[in-house]
Regions:
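Aromatic-anchored transmembrane helix interface
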Residues: 45-48, 69-80, 89-112, 122
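Long extracytoplasmic/lumenal interhelical loops at the membrane interface
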Residues: 156, 284-339
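Hydrophobic transmembrane alpha-helices and their immediate junctions
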Residues: 186, 225-228, 232-233, 338-380
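Transmembrane alpha-helices of multi-pass inner-membrane enzymes
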Residues: 371-380, 388-410
C-alpha cells in the first residue's frame, strides 16, 4: 500500500481535486431535491484530510509534523472542554472546528511532503471547468437551484453553497488566465471565456466579479511592465486592446445579468438612486458593500466580551443558548471569536510560518508566477471581506494547492521524451546525457513511446522510466480517441509539472506534444542536418512547422552546420538556437574496448569499421563497400542492423568482396571491434554530429568521413580525413589517405563534457 501511494501520490491528490465539484453536486442534489441533509462534501474531505495526515506521518515519516500536530490536538482538547463546560450542542461545535482547522492541517501536511508530489495547474483548471459546467448547463436549461432564497436573483446550477462556490471560482480565476494565456487554440479559449462570463454574471454574487477585475488589473500591470521593459510595443498594444474588448463586452451585457439586477434591487431596498449614495452613510456601506457583516461583527464581539475568560482563550464556539450563531463571514474574525486567542494563535502561527517559508523563495519571473501570486492575494483579501475561503473545506483544499504552486522542491524536475531504447546513435546519446545529470539536484523522468530496447537496462537507476504508448489501431476513429484520451490524461495530471522538458527524438509527434505540455521551459533536440534529408525548402519547412518548433524555448543542434542551415530558413528564431553536442562515456568506451572478441582481422589489410544503422536513405554504405572492392588492401567490418541490411549484403556479393566485408549485426558493445580498426568510416549523405566521431577520438582512431561537421567545441576537419561523396573523387582520395600520416589528435573530451554539462544545467535552471 505504501509503495502504491508513493508511486501515485500526485495522481491521488489530483483525483481528489477533480472529484470535488462532482461531490459538491451530489451534496446540492441531496439537500435541494431530496431534502436529505447528508453532506457528501464533508465526508469526502474528511477522508482526504485523514489520508494526507496518514501519508505525511506514516508513509513519508515526517517527524517535523509531530510538534504542530501535538499543538493542534492540545488546542482541540481545551476547545472541547470549553464546549462541554460552557456551551451545548457538542457535535455542531466540533463540526465547526473541523471545518475551520481543515485549512492549516492540510496546508501543513502537504507542505512537508511537497517534494514528493506535483499538482498540475491543468488539474485545478479541470476542476474549475467542472464547476462552471455544472452551473452553466442548468442555467441555460432553467433547471438549477437559486443562489438566494428571497429578493435577489441568481442561479447556482446544481450546487448548494453560493459563498463557497463563488470563492472557488474567484481564486481559480487567475489559474484560468494562465491556461488561456498559454493556449494556442482560439475556439476553445473563446468558448471557455463565454461560459465563465455567463456563470459569474448569472450567479448574482459579487465575489467572482471582483476577482475577475482584480485579475485583469494585475494582468494589465504585468503586460505594461513587460512590454516597456522589452520594448515590444506591438504585443503590448494587442494584449491591452484584447482586454479592453473583453471589458467593453462585459459592460454591454452587464445590464441583462443577475448581478446587475441584484445591484438595482439592493439600491431600491435601501431607497437609493445610485451607487454613489451608498458612501454617504456607514450603515449603507455596511449593508450594501459588506452585506451587513460589520453588524454581525459587532454582535459577535458582544458575545465574546460577555464570555468567560476560558472561552476568550479557547473560543466561544458556534452555538449560543442552544442555537447555531450566525457567522460573520469574515474568516479572520470568525476564527478569532469562535476559537479564542489561543485557537487564533495556533491557526495563524503555523499558517504564517509556512507561508513565509514559501514566499521568501519565490520570484515574479513570468506571467504564471504573477497569476499564482494574484490567486494568493485573492485568498487573503476575500478571506477578510467575504469569508468562506480558509474556513470552508472545499475552498481550503483549492487554496492550499494554489499556494503550494509557489513552492520550490529540493530537486528540479526534468523530463525527456523518446521513441524507444533500441540500439542507435540517438538512443545511446540519450543514455549518456542522462548519465551526465547531477541527481543530487535533479529528479529525472524518461517517457518512451515504447518501453523496449537493448539499451533499456543501461538507463541510469535514478531515472524514472515510463511508457505512454501511441495507438496504431486500424480503426482510425478508435485510434484517434485512444490517443486523444492519453494526451488529455497526461495534460490534466502533468501539465507544467516539470521545470524542464526536452523532446529528444526529433521526428516523433508524440514526444513533441508531451514535451510542450510538461513544461514552459522546453527544448527540441535536432540530431541531424535536415537540409540533406529534404530536397527543398518547402519540405524542410514542413518538417519543422508541423512540429511547431517556434513554440520551443530552446532548439538544440549537435552541429554548427545543421544550426546554420536551420537559421537560413528561420532567421527569426536565432535567439532560441544553440549547439550542444551529445555526451559519451569515455571510461566505459575504453574499458569495454578491451573485452575479447572472436573476430580477427585479415593479415596485411587495413581495417575499416562502420558502426551505425543500416539505412540507405542516409548512411550510403555502398560507398564503403565500393572502397573495399577497388582497394584490395582494405577490409570492412559492419556493426549494426537496419532495413537495408539485405540490400548491402546483396551488393557485397555483387562486388565479390564477401571475404573482406563482414556483417556482425547489432552489438551492445561495439568498442572491441572499433579498437581493432585502422580507420572508423562514415560515408553518409548527411549527419548531425555522429557520436561515432567522439567514440573514435576517445579510442585514438583515424576517421574517414564524408561529413565535415563541427560542434560547440570540436571541428572534425582537424581530426578526420574528409572524402568526397562523389565515388570517383572518393576513390582517388582514399588511395592518397593510405599513404598519409595518422590524423587523429588527442583531446580532453571529459573536460569538454564537464563544460557542456554546465550549459545544460543553465537550461534546466531557467
Amino acid at each position: 500500500m505504501k509503495k502504491f501511494i508513493k508511486k501515485n501520490i500526485s495522481k491521488i491528490i489530483s483525483i481528489f481535486i477533480i472529484l470535488s465539484p462532482i461531490i459538491d453536486v451530489l451534496t446540492g442534489i441531496c439537500i435541494n431535491t431530496f431534502n436529505v441533509n447528508f453532506t457528501f462534501g464533508i465526508v469526502f474531505r474528511i477522508i482526504f484530510l485523514l489520508f494526507v495526515v496518514y501519508v505525511s506521518l506514516f508513509v513519508y515519516r515526517k517527524k517535523q509534523l509531530l510538534l504542530p500536530y501535538t499543538m493542534f490536538l492540545l488546542y482541540f482538547a481545551f476547545y472541547a472542554i470549553g464546549i462541554l463546560l460552557f456551551n451545548d450542542n457538542f457535535l455542531l461545535n466540533i463540526q465547526g472546528m473541523i471545518k475551520v482547522y481543515y485549512f492549516p492541517i492540510i496546508f501543513l501536511s502537504l507542505y512537508y511532503i511537497k517534494d514528493y508530489f506535483k499538482i498540475s495547474k491543468m488539474t485545478l483548471f479541470s476542476s474549475l471547468t467542472l464547476y462552471l459546467t455544472f452551473i452553466f448547463i442548468p442555467t441555460v436549461l432553467g433547471i438549477g437551484y437559486e443562489t438566494y432564497e428571497i429578493t435577489k436573483a441568481g442561479t447556482l446550477g446544481f450546487f448548494n453553497s453560493a459563498n463557497e462556490i463563488s470563492g472557488i471560482i474567484s481564486i481559480l480565476t487567475p489559474i484560468m488566465f494562465i491556461i488561456i494565456f498559454r493556449s494556442k487554440q482560439s475556439i476553445p479559449k473563446i468558448v471557455l471565456l463565454l461560459m465563465y462570463l455567463v456563470v459569474i454574471l448569472m450567479m448574482g454574487t459579487k465575489t467572482p466579479i471582483i476577482a475577475l477585475f482584480f485579475t485583469i488589473g494585475i494582468s494589465v500591470g504585468y503586460l505594461l511592465l513587460k512590454g516597456l521593459k522589452e520594448k515590444n510595443y506591438k504585443n503590448l498594444w494587442i494584449s491591452i486592446c484584447s482586454i479592453i474588448v473583453l471589458l467593453f463586452g462585459i459592460a454591454l451585457i452587464l445590464p441583462k445579468t443577475n448581478f446587475y439586477k441584484n445591484i438595482e434591487t439592493h439600491l431600491d431596498y435601501l431607497g437609493l438612486n445610485n451607487v454613489f449614495e451608498v458612501f454617504t452613510d456607514n450603515h449603507l456601506v455596511d449593508h450594501f458593500i459588506f452585506s451587513s457583516r460589520l453588524s454581525f461583527l459587532k454582535d459577535k464581539a458582544v458575545l465574546y466580551k460577555l464570555a468567560p475568560l476560558y472561552q476568550k482563550a479557547f473560543g466561544i464556539g458556534y452555538t449560543h443558548k442552544g442555537k447555531e450563531t450566525k457567522m460573520i463571514e469574515m474568516d479572520y474574525f470568525d476564527i478569532y471569536f469562535s476559537h479564542g486567542l489561543m485557537g487564533f494563535f495556533v491557526f495563524f502561527m503555523i499558517t504564517l510560518y509556512i507561508l513565509h517559508k514559501i514566499l521568501e523563495k519565490t520570484n515574479m519571473k513570468n506571467y504564471e508566477y504573477w497569476m499564482i501570486h494574484t490567486s494568493l492575494l485573492l485568498i487573503i483579501i476575500l478571506s477578510f471581506f467575504t469569508g468562506h475561503i480558509i474556513t470552508a473545506p472545499s475552498v481550503s483544499l483549492v487554496s492550499v494547492i494554489i499556494i503550494l504552486l509557489l513552492t520550490k522542491t529540493k530537486k528540479k524536475r526534468l523530463l525527456f521524451t523518446g521513441k524507444n531504447l533500441e540500439v542507435g546513435g540517438i538512443e545511446k546519446a540519450q543514455i549518456n546525457l542522462l548519465n551526465n545529470i547531477n541527481y543530487n539536484k535533479y529528479e529525472v523522468t524518461l517517457i518512451l513511446e515504447e518501453k523496449k530496447g537493448e539499451l533499456l537496462e543501461r538507463v541510469n537507476k535514478n531515472v524514472i522510466v515510463r511508457e505512454i504508448k501511441v495507438s496504431n489501431n486500424d480503426n482510425i476513429i478508435l485510434r484517434k480517441l485512444i490517443n486523444a484520451y492519453r494526451k488529455l490524461k497526461f495534460k490534466i495530471f502533468e501539465y507544467d509539472t516539470y521545470d524542464f522538458s526536452c523532446c529528444y527524438t526529433t521526428y516523433s509527434y508524440s514526444c513533441n506534444k508531451l514535451t510542450k505540455i510538461a513544461s514552459i521551459n522546453t527544448a527540441f533536440y535536432v540530431h541531424s542536418d535536415y537540409k540533406y534529408v529534404y530536397n527543398n525548402e518547402e519540405e524542410y519547412r514542413k518538417f519543422f512547422d508541423s512540429r511547431k518548433v517556434d513554440e520551443y524555448v530552446h532548439i538544440i543542434f549537435v552541429s554548427n552546420e545543421s544550426k546554420e542551415a536551420f537559421l537560413g530558413y528561420y532567421p527569426n528564431l536565432k535567439d532560441k538556437v544553440l549547439v550542444l553536442n551529445n555526451f559519451i562515456d569515455t571510461n566505459e568506451i575504453i574499458t569495454k574496448s578491451k573485452e575479447k572478441i572472436e573476430a580477427t582481422r585479415i593479415k596485411d589489410k587495413k581495417l575499416l569499421v562502420f558502426v551505425g544503422r543500416l539505412d540507405d536513405s542516409s548512411k550510403k554504405l555502398k560507398r564503403a563497400i565500393r572502397i573495399v572492392k577497388e582497394e584490395k588492401d582494405f577490409e570492412l567490418w559492419i556493426i549494426g542492423d537496419g532495413p537495408d541490411r539485405g540490400k548491402y549484403e546483396k551488393y557485397t556479393k555483387e562486388c565479390k568482396v564477401e571475404d573482406r566485408v563482414t556483417f556482425f549485426g547489432i552489438k551492445l558493445n561495439p568498442y572491441p571491434y572499433m579498437a581493432k580498426a585502422d580507420y572508423i568510416i562514415l560515408t553518409s549523405d548527411y549527419e548531425g554530429f555522429p557520436v561515432t566521431y567522439l567514440e573514435a577520438i576517445t579510442l585514438n582512431k583515424d576517421i574517414i568521413t564524408t561529413i565535415p561537421t563541427s560542434d560547440d567545441y570540436i571541428d572534425i576537419k582537424e581530426y578526420a580525413h574528409i572524402i568526397s561523396k562523389n565515388e570517383k573523387e572518393m576513390l582517388k582520395e582514399i588511395h592518397n589517405i593510405i599513404n598519409e600520416y595518422n590524423k587523429y589528435k588527442k583531446i580532453d573530451i571529459d573536460k569538454i563534457q564537464k563544460e557542456r554539462a554546465k550549459k545544460f544545467e543553465e537550461l534546466f535552471n531557467e
